[in-house]
Amino acid sequence: MKQMKVFIHILVTAFILSSCSIQKRCQAPELNLPDEIIAGENDTLTIADMSWWELYSDSTLSKLIKKTLRNNRNMQAAEAHIKQMEELYRVSKASRWPTIGAQLFADHETNDYYGEKFSKSPEFSLKASLGWEIDLWGSLRWGKRKGAAEYLASVEAARAMQMTLIAETAIAYFELVALDQELEIVLQTVKTREESVNQARLRFEGGLTSETAYQQAQVELASASALIPELEQKIALKENQIAVLAGEYPSKVERGEFDLNVTWPENIPIGLPSTLLQRRPDVRQAEQQLQAAMAAVGIAYADRFPRLTISLV
């Protein structure tokens, strides 16, 4: 009975000490921002919440972006990192709870005395253990906060990569469409220059113009024709860039019919000025990394003090 009272006193004392922990919460620094920002309109909706590439009404681009987000190697690595941080966070939470262990032993002996064997009955034993670390100085709580901050930082890093991939894919696609249109213009120009060369040749042979005009038409045709290989190479490189972003081998990229007469919305929502920085995933990631660093400091400080672990076997 006395031992039980001592054990209860130890538990009560441990809980009292743990409630008087030395840990401090992280606080956001003062940024000294202006009281107001002059802006045209305030809207809680922001274009970051919209599938802005759908404004172009290009289903091919939408499919390409979805495929890129699904197959991009860096995006897959970021998603795997999120799962890793999530599991580590679960481990940090579980460390605050008691641990239960069990061991099973089996023994069987056979002795041989001058050719006569004597066997003993098998012996079995089971041992159970219970361990619990009392979080006196907040080390385990700091570990939980550190795991949560690292998990949230990995989520924001994936969001930043997703936004970057969407922007890079859309820009590369529009550049590819622009190169296609430029090549089409050059081909039409070459066709026109070929007709001009034929007309200049007929005029020269008929004595209507000098040879200089005929040679000038040939020079203009050669100049326009020289642009075709350069544009074809740029198109191939741009297709390779899009294929790499989509996690595929270099191949032909499907194009949609790009409408130059796009109907844009009258107002593109930019969101509330007070939340613009808070919505940026790189800023949010940096904030969570700061929280994780502060938690690591708390863990290191708490490790300076002795730990109390209760073990029962």
List the predicted regions and their residue ranges.
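Sec-dependent bacterial lipoprotein signal peptides
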Residues: K2-S18
